[in-house]
Amino acid sequence: MADDSATPGVRVPSHRYGRHYHRRKIKEAVDSISSLPDVILQHILSFIPTKLAITTSLLSKRWRHVWCDTPSLSFNDYRLEAPFIDETLTRYTASKMMRFHLHTSLINNVPHLESWIKFAMSRNVDHLSLDLWNQVANKFKFPDFFHINSSLKQLTVVLDFSDTMIAICLKKLYLSTCLLSDESMANILFGCPILESLTLDHCGGLRVLDLSKSLRLRTLEINCNIWVPELTAMQIVAPHTHCLRLRNSKLPCSLVDVSSLKEAKLNICIDSFSKTIKADFLQVTLLKMLEKLHNVEKLTLGGNFLQILSVAELRGVPFPMFKVKDLTLETVIFQYVIPGIERVLQNSPDLKKLTLLTKDFYHKPGEYLGDHMDLEGFNLDQCWKSKYGVFWNKSCLDVESEHVVSFVELMLKNTKALDKMVVLLEDHYVRFKEMVPRLSHNYNISIALYTFKPQS
């Protein structure tokens, strides 16, 4: 009997045939992947959680033991219990481990932590990552054998504790949500003599971060130091550091010695605008930071940082000169960043490359600065007006194509030696796209435009 869905000359596949066809295509895809060498399959599996990688053993006999020799193990489900992890380690066969990641919140796992770390060390692990929740972290101490390991190159620690650690071969250290003291940090640094990169993420308690004895440390990143004793700015002594990235939440840091710095990325986040910290204090502190960047050639400034610099410019506070050759501005386009940007550009005579990134960066509403300037007696209709006569949008939500064009022209007018500009913005600014060739021709520079679709 003919299929009811058929017509003369055309036969529409039945649902049964469609399912069979779909299964066949999946099988062909699996077979195609299965033909790859083990080393490639294991490299692919190293990018997914180990629990998921183990499920590939059900695909076929070909896959049964592939996961056992992957270069990395990742136990990223904090609910995983000890029997599962123990069984996984028993079946693991790789002699060399690149990365071991453990995320757990189960208090019952605490007695097993030392043996799991010891297992990773026995496989000469390069990168050890521990993310332990409070109730687990409070009962955990680094075992003695950890201190004499010679293979560990990178350590990521997410713990609510302060402790000392010694890892003589460690090159990268990432500490998150740790309560530190100057003494404990000094002990950690003493135990890591060849450390090259240090990241402090949401750590608190430090008054002075002294890196003067870390002769190989080249990269320092501090993200939201959440607590500073007595609201004093943390001092940074880093004479050997080449790259500095700061994003502070309570107070900007005080740069005591960064004499070797070549690259810097600076911003302050929302808490820096709390009522307990005045804008005039912030402007003084931020300008002191900029004065320490006299040798920096690659500089990135965030939108909140630029807003405070705008206040300083409107008040007539002198800015330092810069040797910057590559400048990136991570900001939305609105009136509260204009004066600060103009002054930074004018004080950067050697600038060759300028990058504008406008992609959804979080900014404190500029109205705060407007209210602050109003209290100081400024004419708000004039103080935020560009010297070129442009009146800017007050809200970062009201950016039109003409604002983008005016913004780019303003930056071009305030530079003298610029060779290249890179602009990243949302793709609906059609008029600006049309203006790029003219701007490039008029100012004799190369403009690279990259667009993206805004998130819905």
Curated annotation (Swiss-Prot):
SMART domains, A to Z: FBOX
UniProt repeat feature LRR, residue ranges: 177-202, 203-213, 228-253, 278-303, 333-358, 396-422
Keyword NAD found: no
Positions of the F-box domain: 30-78
Matching InterPro entries: F-box-like_dom_sf, F-box_AtFBL13-like, F-box_dom, F-box_plant, LRR_At1g61320_AtMIF1, LRR_dom_sf
Keywords tagged on the record: Leucine-rich repeat, Repeat
Superkingdom, taxonomy of origin: Eukaryota
Name recorded for this polypeptide: Putative F-box/LRR-repeat protein At3g18150
